[in-house]
A protein has these predicted regions:
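...captures the hydrophobic TM-helix bundle architecture rather than a specific catalytic motif
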Residues: 1-255
Length: 255
């Protein structure tokens, strides 16, 4: 009969820490490559089609605040555990978890607000009675043009005049682009939703890891001499925060 063997049972704390850090760096690298691929696709796509820019809603600003603040108790949790203060470390992890939940709620609320304004999808019925999902066109979005949103074509913002859209170079307003705006797939909305919810999914893994480590602290499996799991959790959590800061700037300010 085979027996389960803990290959790290006789390893020194230094070896365990290096191993967990290496594994976490591999995970972080994989996530970086995933989001780099998506944002690269966004840059290529933006230059080929009409592209909508939206101003940042209050919900997304709050999500940025929560994710940045959450790194503080996460850092303290690791530091306190190294100092042997288990209960204080557990408290800081609980605060991190609550801030992570707040981030997730505000992220979802931010996208829901954009979706309700027309950036999401519409559900219709097929002849067979099934639900058909259609991503909304650019013209479905509501708000004050030039303030709440604007649409670019070939890198230049369209001009709205008398309810019609025109290229910036069409100074005499002779060739309206309204029909194209009303029918063009809102690719920017689709990519924003993918980035938001993909980040939420990865952050949820960090939240689960937090709960596991809170329980490990509670039952005494983590200590000042065995903090490697919490250290790896901290690496992942800080990375998730940095990743959202990058995505926030990329989506709402850079592209």
């Amino acid at each position: 009969m085979s027996q389960n063997v803990d290959v790290f049972s006789e390893a020194t704390p230094e070896v365990k820490l290096r191993t967990k850090k290496m594994m976490m760096w591999l995970i972080i690298f994989a996530v970086v490559m995933l989001f780099a691929g998506i944002t690269s696709a966004l840059m290529v796509l933006k230059g080929k089609i009409m592209w909508m820019h939206v101003t940042v809603s209050g919900w997304f600003w709050w999500s940025l605040v929560w994710v940045i603040l959450s790194s503080i108790p996460m850092y303290l949790a690791v530091k306190l555990l190294k100092d042997g203060k288990t209960k204080a470390s557990m408290l800081m992890l609980a605060v991190t978890f609550l801030l992570g939940i707040s981030f997730t709620i505000t992220q979802n609320a931010g996208w829901t607000e954009l979706s309700e304004r027309g950036m999401g999808y519409t559900i219709s019925k097929t002849p067979e009675g099934l639900d058909a999902y259609h991503w909304n066109p650019l013209g479905k979005f509501t708000g004050a043009y030039g303030e709440d949103y604007w649409i670019e074509s070939r890198g230049k913002a369209l001009v709205q005049w008398n309810g019609e859209f025109y290229d910036a170079d069409d100074v005499n307003h002779e060739k309206p682009k309204t029909a194209q705006v009303m029918s063009t797939f809102n690719a920017s909305g689709a990519l924003i939703s993918v980035l938001v919810y993909l980040h939420i999914i990865h952050l949820a893994l960090g939240l689960i890891y937090l709960l596991i480590n809170i329980n490990r602290l509670r039952i005494g499996k983590l200590s000042a001499s065995n903090y490697m799991s919490l250290h790896a959790n901290g690496m992942y959590w800080h990375f998730m925060g940095i990743l959202w800061v990058y995505l926030f700037l990329f989506v709402f300010f850079i592209y």
